[in-house]
A protein has these predicted regions:
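Preference for long, well-ordered alpha-helical segments
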Residues: 105-147
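Helix-turn-helix repeat elements of alpha-solenoid scaffolds
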Residues: 16-29, 57-73, 109-111
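Flexible helix-coil transition and linker loops at the boundaries of alpha-helical arrays
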Residues: 32-39, 72-82, 119-123
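TPR repeat positional signature
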Residues: 8-9, 44-47, 83, 90, ...
């Protein structure tokens, strides 16, 4: 079931490269299906990718916040999948806060992303997240609210 659910999630994410609205609808349907009792990793991944598909920085911030909140469920310890996902979640939150001009909170979230980066492997994913942290740090230093690819 878990593998099937992740396959559904990543199929919806892949739609984003072709049709953002279809991807947004598919992920929103998965979010609704998962409900509040869905697996934390599934909920977190869906919300994280929904954030990337929003039209405004404010909407993206809302979904990035949901993604992080979904990772932390009282009484459920973080598994390895979520631990490895935290740097990306904090990085996305940092960038969303930067985009809305909340630079102090963005810096705090970026520090958390850096602090959790030690769990990342020295692979393509780890390098992308570390480069994203450096990129957002540069944008924060300039107090830029420009939307740019990370």
């Amino acid at each position: 079931m878990t593998d099937d659910r992740m396959a559904d999630i990543y199929a919806a994410v892949r739609l984003g490269g072709v049709n953002r609205e279809a991807a947004r609808q598919a992920l929103r349907m998965l979010w609704d299906q998962l409900g509040t009792d869905g697996e934390p990793l599934h909920r977190s991944v869906v919300a994280h990718h929904l954030a990337d598909l929003q039209d405004t920085a404010e909407e993206a911030l809302l979904w990035d916040t949901r993604a992080l909140d979904s990772a932390f469920v009282p009484g459920i310890p973080l598994d390895d999948g979520l631990l490895g996902f935290l740097p990306s979640l904090y990085l996305s939150l940092a960038d969303s806060h930067r985009l809305v001009g909340d630079f102090d909170v963005a810096r705090m979230q970026l520090a958390l992303a850096r602090g959790h980066a030690s769990v990342l492997a020295d692979d393509a994913y780890g390098r992308v997240i570390r480069a994203g942290v450096d990129h957002v740090a540069t944008l924060l230093a300039a107090e830029s609210t420009d939307r740019v690819a990370c």
